[in-house]
Amino acid sequence: LLNTLTEAVGKPVTEIHTKDLYAGNSPFRQLTPEQRSNLIGQIFQWLRDRKHSVVFTAVDKGNFLANRDNEAFHADLGTLWRHMAFHITLALQKHGQTFEKNKGNTVLIFDNKVNDQRNFTKLLLNPPTWSDTYYAKKKKQEQLDQIVDVPHFVDSKEVALIQLADFLCYFLRKHLELSLGLAAPKFDGEVDVMNGYATNTLKLASPKAHIFLNRGRCPASDYFYRYAPTTIR
């Protein structure tokens, strides 16, 4: 992918900066909107060809900040980042245990997050018991048994898949901002463009019931559901 981008712009591209690619900022300034759209399409196709799947989450930040202090579960998580990272962890656990002999095959790799790394690691080593119901933990089952030990934190410049996660997050976030009226479209048709990119992203996602369960929610799944934007859950 980086080679494809390098060939397109005629100079080395060492990191996928999706905002710059989409908007036509340097180093993509000389490319036409159609050329940039084609490159974005190639990245989505690359993900599809390799059968990558996605687990995502989203939070209505205003709702979350206004109510977090009244949430008993929030005391165990502590920050918005940990709220989202733990939700992803639980969704991966729920998804992973649907496969046979898959125990301990999931490694969590995050972009560097200095302020949260230590506490999040402690959280995963000793998960709160309220989270067990999210994935219907069995009596003799170990907590988060799909997850390998502790999370890893890396510099996204050195890990291309982190950059691709950012790529997908960019379009999903822009879609949510436009659909909720939190941002205005910058050109005619941008809402439709973002709807298309969001659809491509969601087609890669694991079953929605592993992330935002529409009914029959336990308190843990309801906690994450209630703070998700209405247009994504």
Language-model-detected regions and their locations in the chain:
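Phosphate-ester processing/binding pockets and catalytic centers
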Residues: 1-233
